[in-house]
Amino acid sequence: VRVLTHEIMNSITPIISLSDTLCERAIQQGMDEENLMLQGLETIHRRSNGLMNFVENYRKLSRLSSPVLAPVRVGELLGDIKKLFLSSKVHYIYKVEDENQMLMIDRSQMEQVLINLLKNAGEACMEQENPEVVVETSYQAEKHIFRLSVTDNGCGILPNVVDKIFIPFFTTKPTGSGIGLSLCKQILTLHGGSIRVSSEEGKGSCFTLKLVVK
């Protein structure tokens, strides 16, 4: 609620202020009135769009449906994901322990998680001389635990930031919405799984998701 209130107030306050100013100037009809009006309207339009985008992202978080589980092969799941990143300048490496491993998942939701993680990893290492992302799977039979990790050789995440990245609407990207990793965490939680991150500044990050195989 605090985050929601803060974001809405940040958008509404300048809109109200500018509206008041434009009304006053319209009455006074001072110099450079046309430029002032245009600048004010542009700001109102931009902040209104920002507020609309925020509300839409909030809806995505609050309306995430319960997963519809169905058996999916790991190889099949990753095969479709691979196609989306074929044209990337980043070198994506896939180390799949068992392509025939079956998972009971909501395929659409899990694809959303993987796309988000691979996209973020690619962006994180894009500026490296040899940008590389490794996707690796493993299965711990005695505990029925399936793991999938996404590791990049990017710049890593700052220590004071790493604990906040799963918080809704928290982002360090200028154009980021801050909901991607929050959605990932929610989806994994709804699947009875988890997601964690380990990162070393200057060396890269590793996101690991864990699912119980039933």
Annotated model-derived regions:
Residues 68-82:
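A conserved beta-strand-to-alpha-helix junction within the catalytic ATP-binding
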Residues 74, 156-164:
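Short helix N-cap motif at coil->helix boundaries in the Bergerat
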Residues 91-102:
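Conserved catalytic submotifs in the C-terminal HATPase_c
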Residues 180, 184:
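Short alpha-helical Gxxx[C/S/T] motif in the catalytic ATP-binding
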Residues 192-193:
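Conserved glycine-rich
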